[in-house]
Amino acid sequence: MASMARAAGGRPKTAATGEPAPVDSLVSDYLTSCRARGLSVRTLDNAYGFALERVFLPWCRREGIRTTTELSQLVLDRFTTDLLSRQSERGRPLSKASVHTYVRPVRQMLHWAEGIGEPVTGRPQLPKQPRREKEVLSRHEIDRLEDAARTERDKVIIRLFADCGLRLSELTGISAGDIRRTANRSYLRVHGKGDRERLVPVLPDLARRLDRLGRAQGGDRAGDRLFTSSRRGSGGEHEPLTESGVAQMVSAVAREAQLGKAVHPHLLRHSWMTEMLRKGMNPIQLAAIAGASEKVIAEHYAHLSQDDAYEAVARALLGSR
């Protein structure tokens, strides 16, 4: 396979010999490079693999495009245009946000390809999206969610999403040994995207509740995961909660709380990040705690309202007077 052939310096043979690379080999090489950079298999599949292997490559085959030299700006613009006119599984046009998720990995791949010597002459354009405020949950709504949860386990899960900004996959991976203490402060060791580890601050009350939850379960669970199912597995032990199980619980609790909103774990994380910014947390510090890049913070949290902007300026200019 062309994707397995390498020249000196890790470049595809096609680039080293001056011949344009086949598009399918280029995709394979790029995904290999992403994995070598430390991206997790999950991130690779969800953020890059689907867009490149299931959307971009089939489109190239339908259009008869075989090599990078055929990916002119006009051709790449046609790729974006075709996506904008494509229908989703529900029979509706793809949203501009969905088109972004498919186009961005192609742009990143072509940028990488240019860096290794491929004859890249264009980039697919990202359709302009209307900027609007994203929905968030208020502290009152989060309190209602916790009140509606039926078990202490579920209440603690709600709080970890809302007060620590954890991702769904991060929460289900927590073990009892991930609770760390230094002097009078508590932290949660979290394994985030790309298997990167970070410490997330946990306020005293929530830390105590985590301790009690761990002690209550004791050794009556399969493995070392902190959050387990109330049902026992075939071995008589409580099995770890799955991501789908947690997501279903959050949705069910939201219906019980009658919030009138579609609530999911990421909305709780998003609400936490928005609140931290509104209360003046440094975006660089927030990115480190949340396990997100500063670029993501800038792109996805530019939705703060005019009132938020006014308050930020007032704090900066009037706070010390």
Task: Give each language-model segment a name.
Residues 42-43, 192-212, 224-251:
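C-terminal catalytic core of Y-nucleophile DNA break-rejoin enzymes
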Residues 139-168, 194-196:
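Basic, Lys/Arg- and aromatic-enriched nucleic-acid-binding interface segment
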Residues 1-17, 315-321:
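C-terminal secondary-structure termini that scaffold catalytic or DNA-interacting sites
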Residues 200, 220-222, 247-288, 292-295, ...:
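Short, basic (Lys/Arg/His-rich) helix/loop patches that form interaction surfaces
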